[in-house]
Amino acid sequence: HGATPVVEYDGFEYDLAGKKFSELPEELQSAISQYRFSVQCLENYTMQEAESLFFNINSGVALSAVQKSKAKMGTDLIQFFSGLLEGMFFTQAIHITEAQARREDDLLMLLQSALLLDNRHDGLEYKTISAAYCLAYAESIKGSYTEEKREILREAVRFLDAAFPAKNKFLRKNNVPVVAVMARVAQEQGVTPDRFRGFINDFASQEHPAYDEASGSGNVKARSVQMRLRMMFLAFCGYFGLEAGAVGKPFADTVLLDEGTQAAEP
């Protein structure tokens, strides 16, 4: 690679940038050729055993919580979520830093979106959408994430793929799960992807003090997430001339639209 820095080997420095293997000094070619990988073949392992082994092998490595969730959720769900992450939205549109990419925060955002959609459609309770909580969520849906739930998430992501063909500064980690839920609301109201993108751009250009406050410290707590959902939902209804009370709320029925907090127990 052209950006490869100078390396030191056996007391000498070598410039490797932009060179092929055949262009390297003989001593480096020899050192590389003599390197051996330790490969172990595990036969007759079930997928559950392989997933457990992966988690245990990496438990001593500094993996992020969401990376550990890949071992917890199982092969089937990994394949499902990985397929959704290959679309335009998660590969081109979201605003993600290099460090976030290394932690696989795109998967975290997708898990957060799935969790919030589960809350909206099935009343799944949650206290936070932190990475650690999403790790537990990933384990809890293993073997129980129905085709109906998959289709809801799949349709929302496809809608986002169509709505955002290029990078959008608003699509940061804090906002993506909220936008994903609102994409589902937009679908239900017959809003096209292009018009939805117009709404998001308009929302991003306006001042929303309550939304901004809920995006600060503690932004992964349920109350803050619900406040952001509430503010974007009300802005959505105003933008498209919809009566908020006649549109499906972006969260479970146990959350009050006029408060953005959990309803009191009767």
Where are these regions (language model features)?
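Basic- and aromatic-enriched surface patches that contact anionic nucleotides/nucleic acids
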Residues: 1-128, 252-257, 261-265
